Amino acid sequence: MNQENFIRRYFIIGERRFSNYWWATVILIGSFGFLLTGISSYISTSLNSTALSSNIESQMQLPFFLSMLKNSNSTGAINFFPQGLLMCFYGSLGFLLSIYWWCLIFWNVGGGFNEFNKKENFIRIFRWGYPGKNRKIDLYYTLKDVESIRVEILQGFDSQRTIFLKLKGNREIPITGIGQPLTLQEIEKQASELANFLQVSLEGL
């Protein structure tokens, strides 16, 4: 028998999904747009409200972009208060959210693998967590601790499809990824293959 007959390993993507890359990028670009709009409204409002602005212009030439901002404010550009201030506020929130999202992607929170090893008689559940004490979540169980494989399917707006590893002592360990539910066919196939491989019963289907 080859290696595949003794060892099964299922990889969990975690936060490094295409959808997370997409939304983190979109939010980052959008937040920069809001911040630049708010900052430009502050600069243009300041230039127009400062009594010395005309004297400064007469003595030295303003940079091109400052002159454009000053002129744009007189032609209907937004004021810093309250529109520009709100733009800065929402832009800052979006920027912080995008940075947090990129950190999750970099750390790959929730990513890892499930290994079922008949050759050495163990099950290994590995996940990456947040930086700190629990950065690595590495759990080991023996094959004889497994009683069955249970599938839980919750339908609705936020549908969830989860495979649980039922262990002795009424313990249940979820072994599917979070945030990207598998299709019903994929759940059935993976659960059936795993139950056959471990030679335990399958519950929930």
UniProtKB/Swiss-Prot annotation:
Annotated GO biological process: photosynthesis
Disulfide bonds: none
One Pfam entry name: Ycf4
One GO cellular component, as annotated: photosystem I
Location within or outside the cell: Plastid, Chloroplast thylakoid membrane
Secretion signal, residue range per the UniProt entry: none
The UniProt record lists the keyword Chloroplast: yes
Positions of transmembrane segments: 23-43, 86-106
Keywords from the UniProt entry: Chloroplast, Membrane, Photosynthesis, Plastid, Thylakoid, Transmembrane, Transmembrane helix
Topology versus the membrane: Multi-pass membrane protein
Domain of life: Eukaryota
Role, per record: Seems to be required for the assembly of the photosystem I complex.
Family under the similarity heading: Belongs to the Ycf4 family.
Protein name as annotated: Photosystem I assembly protein Ycf4
